[in-house]
Amino acid sequence: MRPQLSDYQHLASGKVRELYRVDDEHLLVVASDRISAYDYVLDSMIPDKGRILTAMSVFFFGLVDAPNHLAGPPDDPRIPDEVLGRALVVRQLEMLPVECVARGYLTGSGLLDYQASGKVCGIALPPGLVGASKFAEPLFTPATKAELGDHDENISFAQVIETVGGVRANQLRDRTLQIYVKAADHALTRGVIIADTKFEFGADRDGNLLLADEIFTPDSSRYWPADEYRAGVVQNSFDKQFVRNWLTSAESGWDRGGDQPPPPLPDHIIEATRERYIEAYERISGLGFGEWIGPGA
């Protein structure tokens, strides 16, 4: 159920976020406690998830120090009290139709592509790699930006050039990798591997490229404990992969290849997911989630 904010016009609902108009140049983005997996929005909420995602994004926007869409602090007076801590005022941008994915390790859809072709997004990789193998250098592996209910598809860099032009494509690749390396280096000092992550970018009225949406959240990134890392095995994680793993387990009873939506998450999976998201934030930021603003604080 989305917040009813009388001062602002509701514009759109995403899998997790609600979008409202503040004025001609600014939007209010509200992160809900919904969780999605395998292109479904699950019939379960993760308590405090929206606040965790917002706290994580705010921390990383400050850390990477890249031009971004933020138009005010997390306690901006334009944010209604009922969504404080899970909402941000941002600049309205023309969003680019590319998911910008940075990968430091072979996992997820990248692993599936490699097993099928020896490549990821058209990039040829050495033979003999296994799940969770670390790349010599991080890869830029873009994807299409799918509509709600559809599936993102990995694409080549040449396809990015066809979509946004050569200059913008190079900007997207270079900015994505620079931001990823800076954040991944920091996380490693905190005992966490950022295996991969995805960004969205938009352009302002002057054509400047700005980092937008969420960054380095447990929804958009894979987080692994560095002290447990070993290539070739399933990694423990502090992210949404924990939910994906349960959905495809015998315990859930769900047939991913069928036409039925996933079942609701049991209480122990909901609580464990919340704990993992909080642990990711606290480990990487060095801050206590109990100190974050908003209802529930």
Curated annotation (Swiss-Prot):
InterPro entries: SAICAR_synt/ADE2_N, SAICAR_synth, SAICAR_synthetase_CS. Gene3D superfamilies: ATP-grasp fold, B domain, Phosphorylase Kinase, domain 1. The keyword Transferase does not apply. PROSITE patterns: SAICAR_SYNTHETASE_1 (PS01057), SAICAR_SYNTHETASE_2 (PS01058). Pfam families: SAICAR_synt (PF01259). Its EC number is 6.3.2.6. Pathway: Purine metabolism; IMP biosynthesis via de novo pathway; 5-amino-1-(5-phospho-D-ribosyl)imidazole-4-carboxamide from 5-amino-1-(5-phospho-D-ribosyl)imidazole-4-carboxylate: step 1/2. One of its GO terms (molecular function) is phosphoribosylaminoimidazolesuccinocarboxamide synthase activity. Keywords: ATP-binding, Ligase, Nucleotide-binding, Purine biosynthesis. GO terms for biological process: 'de novo' IMP biosynthetic process. It catalyses: 5-amino-1-(5-phospho-D-ribosyl)imidazole-4-carboxylate + L-aspartate + ATP = (2S)-2-[5-amino-1-(5-phospho-beta-D-ribosyl)imidazole-4-carboxamido]succinate + ADP + phosphate + 2 H(+). GO terms for cellular component: cytoplasm. The keyword Ligase applies. CDD domains: SAICAR_synt_Sc. It comes from the Bacteria. It is an enzyme of class 6 (ligase). NCBIfam families: PRK13961.1, purC. Belongs to the SAICAR synthetase family. HAMAP family: SAICAR_synth. This is Phosphoribosylaminoimidazole-succinocarboxamide synthase. It comes from Mycobacterium ulcerans (strain Agy99). The lineage of its organism: Bacteria, Bacillati, Actinomycetota, Actinomycetes, Mycobacteriales.
